[in-house]
């Protein structure tokens, strides 16, 4: 069974080797047919502490690393600085 992969934005990098990633999803309400946005935060393992808040990353599910971490950062794009 393939591992799930999600795309999100790094919200926090204050913990060692961990980033908090906000993943947004959109769906249509079954009755009102209005598009709704929901978001969820995931704690993901970042071995080299290379991602900062605002970076777009892809996370992949993995075996439990700690109490909250079940995702690993696979790849990411650093935020453009002007």
UniProtKB/Swiss-Prot annotation:
Keywords: Ribonucleoprotein, Ribosomal protein, RNA-binding, rRNA-binding. Belongs to the universal ribosomal protein uS17 family. GO terms for molecular function: rRNA binding; structural constituent of ribosome. PANTHER family: 40S RIBOSOMAL PROTEIN S11 FAMILY MEMBER (PTHR10744), SMALL RIBOSOMAL SUBUNIT PROTEIN US17M (PTHR10744:SF1). This is Small ribosomal subunit protein uS17. CDD domains: Ribosomal_uS17. One of the primary rRNA binding proteins, it binds specifically to the 5'-end of 16S ribosomal RNA. It holds the Pfam family Ribosomal_S17. It comes from the Bacteria. GO terms for cellular component: cytosolic small ribosomal subunit. HAMAP family: Ribosomal_uS17_B. Part of the 30S ribosomal subunit. One of its GO terms (biological process) is translation. The lineage of its organism: Bacteria, Pseudomonadati, Pseudomonadota, Alphaproteobacteria, Hyphomicrobiales.
